[in-house]
Amino acid sequence: MLVVTITYVLSRTQFSASDSLFIAFAILLGQFVVGWSNDLIDFPRDRAAKRLGKPLVAATITQSTLKISIGIVLLSALIISLFSPLGVSGTAIHFLGLLSATAYNLKLKSTLLSVVPYIVSFGALPWAIYVAAGTKPPTWIVLGFVLFASAFHFLNVLKDLDSDVDQDVMGLPQVLGRQKSILIALLLAGLGILDVVLANIRV
């Protein structure tokens, strides 16, 4: 929900409240697609690691039902995104972000390039909003999205780091290890804060 909230706030700089809600809803549907497809792809590993917090592992939903749900929500995300203020150009960028996130789920999470989809997907979000409004996002906003998203990547893997290593899911944080990942995350977050502060001081 954090991504959706940020989307709404950022959209309000360019669009009305109702239009911003429309855009945020399109992004929310995209987030569902990414999260559910990740659960589907990771199911064998999640089951082996006994992650009962996952619906598929807990058997609260079947794989076939989840596949159908992903298809329906993906189509809904496309239609709503196209008919929202994002239009064709913003939707194209939105779906570039979804494609990047899917590439992470499918393959890149297990490579040294694991942070790249975070850079692409979250860096694309402000572009989708601003391009749809007929302008381009300030550099500091894009940079902030990239820095904070990258920091999140290094922190987000920590809870499953040991089981990831056991299952040979060797993304960049897993290769670097827990301590280095925490340090890098703190550095990136610090740079993100500095970016926001300096940009607003100049304003």
Residue ranges, per PLM feature:
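Multi-pass alpha-helical membrane architecture of UbiA-family
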Residues: 1-203
